[in-house]
């Protein structure tokens, strides 16, 4: 099988990822589980050529210099893929993350109504967080798409690499990829403030300068969407503040308390019927109570504020898991494996 056939097989079987690893057969991740494809093991030369042949010259140069590379790749009529090529003890390896050609809507993802409201905010910071593979990009793409279909404006994205491709609908959409189109997230964000955007998507807030620039953009009247790999709203606030030196922390708390619109922390749960996965969300909104807790460095009290803020659209992860179990969408065992307080889900 060549790489196109393997990727077509992967997409047909609704796999989120295709794994190639020298010395082993190809494997796919379906509904969270990694399974072998029933073909012979691939040797180093085969894996290397499969991956090397789809790289551009600059990607090959990066791969040869740094021994690993990230890039995106598209097969027309099938899907786009986010690729990481690397080396391991048996030889070459790569992971292809499937990025569906069709951007799912907020309704198709069963997202709460508040997600649409957040996508139309005139300014502020909206963060979607969670571990790798938790569907952050899918959720953000749906929110950006909702804005694109609803308002007239300019949406600017900075990604590494570009994942979902947005057509300009009501909005003008400009997507920039770190590497071929800009040198870094920080460089693109500096320029962004002079590019007349209404909304900016920052693919990953991975360092101090990027976080600082994203917060500045939100504070100066732009809607900024960003992602972090944190597992809860409280940990997200801690992570942002911890990045800054001690003498800046108070100022950062003040900035964050003014600009934060929401933190959505999500995880994927297996459906009870085994046919797929569904996202469970913790939702913290920038209410006056939450803003005060950020300003006063009382992060530990956020959980109870979220817990009692259901009427405003807030919810803890465990509250959402309880609802998914009650509606027979996920099993109590699955909820227990994802819960902050597992003992709330006996059985």
What feature does the model see in each segment?
Residues 1-347:
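Short, flexible helix-loop junctions that flank or precede catalytic/ligand sites
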């Amino acid at each position: 099988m060549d790489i196109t056939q393997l990727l077509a097989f992967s997409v047909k079987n609704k796999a989120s990822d295709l794994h190639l690893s020298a010395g082993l057969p190809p494997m796919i991740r379906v509904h969270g589980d990694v399974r072998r494809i029933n073909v012979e093991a691939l040797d180093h030369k085969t894996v290397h050529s499969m991956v090397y042949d789809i790289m551009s010259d600059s990607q090959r140069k990066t791969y040869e210099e740094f021994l690993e590379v990230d890039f995106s790749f598209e097969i027309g009529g099938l899907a786009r893929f986010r690729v990481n090529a690397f080396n391991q003890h048996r030889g070459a390896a790569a992971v292809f993350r499937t990025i569906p050609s069709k951007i799912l809507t907020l309704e198709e993802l069963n997202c709460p109504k508040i997600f649409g409201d957040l996508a139309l905010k005139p300014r502020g910071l909206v963060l979607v967080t969670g571990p790798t593979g938790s569907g952050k990009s899918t959720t953000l793409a749906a929110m950006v798409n909702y804005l694109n279909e609803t308002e007239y404006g300019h949406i600017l994205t900075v990604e590494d690499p570009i994942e979902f491709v947005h057509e300009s609908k009501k909005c003008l959409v400009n997507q920039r990829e770190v590497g071929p189109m800009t040198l870094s997230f920080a460089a693109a964000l500096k320029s962004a403030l002079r590019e007349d955007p209404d909304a900016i998507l920052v693919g990953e807030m991975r360092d101090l300068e990027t976080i600082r620039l994203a917060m500045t953009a939100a504070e100066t009247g732009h809607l900024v969407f960003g992602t972090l790999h944190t597992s809860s709203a409280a940990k997200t606030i801690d992570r942002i503040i911890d990045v800054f030196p001690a003498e800046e922390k108070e100022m950062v708390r003040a900035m964050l308390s003014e600009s934060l619109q929401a933190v959505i922390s999500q995880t994927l749960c297996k459906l009870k019927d085994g046919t797929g996965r569904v996202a469970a969300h913790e939702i913290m909104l920038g209410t006056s109570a939450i803003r005060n807790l950020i300003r006063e460095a009382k992060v530990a009290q956020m959980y109870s504020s979220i817990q009692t803020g259901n009427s405003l659209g807030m919810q803890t992860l465990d509250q959402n898991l309880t609802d998914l179990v009650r509606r027979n969408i996920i099993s109590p065992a699955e909820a227990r494996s994802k819960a902050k307080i597992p003992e709330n889900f006996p059985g």
